[in-house]
Design a protein with these regions (language model features):
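Multi-pass alpha-helical transmembrane bundles in non-GPCR membrane proteins
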Residues: 1-216
Length: 216
């Protein structure tokens, strides 16, 4: 039986991302369980879960060949999980790094935006790419509201890993929004969207390193 993957480049990249997240969960959670408290373990579990959800939903959406109505549902889930990943990445920072007042306030804001964003995607999946990217990027940089606290609390190494992840995600979001021909290779299965996928994975790797070294 021949198996057909609808968009091989996009499906494979984020299937790899999902597997990397699953594999990375063990050392991260073991380290947190040994050296950190229950709140850290909970927050890091949310972070890992958000990565698995995003990469899993994306891999499935880009893999399946089904009728349009079902494919549209998978597409909505794919886009909705981006909000989950962003909020999930914020969660350990809010609960472990920041003080209670700033942390819980920021946590409520980002998860509030995530819920609104998911509802928007569920109702308006055809919104322009620039609009989606603007929301994703803006949500990602809400942390500027606590820049001073992060700068004063984190070591320079920790701050740089956190910042690097944000920058890489942002570059990927711009590539996704603009879909410039320069990013499209002669291979039809690997173009600007697949490059966007690689940038998302790069951002996740930076943030995983940050979580493992400085949060767990």
């Amino acid at each position: 039986m021949q198996i057909t993957i609808r968009e091989p480049g996009s499906a494979i990249t984020h299937f790899i991302g999902m597997m990397m997240a699953i594999i990375a969960a063990t050392p991260l959670m073991v380290k947190a369980a040994v050296g950190s408290g229950a709140i850290s373990c909970f927050a890091l579990a949310i972070f890992i879960g958000s990565m698995v959800a995003l990469y899993g939903a994306s891999a499935i959406y880009h893999s399946v060949t089904v009728r349009d109505g079902i494919l549209k549902i998978f597409r909505k889930l794919d886009h909705m999980m981006i909000f989950v990943l962003i909020a999930g990445s914020y969660t350990p920072v809010c609960l472990v790094i920041l003080d209670a007042k700033s942390g819980y306030t920021l946590l409520a804001v980002v998860w509030g935006i995530a819920i609104i964003g998911m509802i928007t995607k569920a109702c308006w999946i055809t919104c322009p790419k620039w609009f989606s990217s603007a929301i994703y990027i803006s949500m990602g940089w809400v942390c500027l509201s606590v820049f001073g606290s992060l700068w004063n609390t984190l070591s320079r190494g920790a701050f740089l890993w956190l910042l690097a992840g944000g920058i890489i995600y942002t570059v990927g979001g711009v590539i996704y929004a603009l879909k410039l021909p320069i990013f499209n290779s002669k291979h039809k299965n690997f173009g600007s969207h697949e490059i966007f996928h690689l940038f998302v994975m790069g951002g996740s790797i930076c943030h995983f390193i940050f979580m493992y070294l400085y949060v767990a």
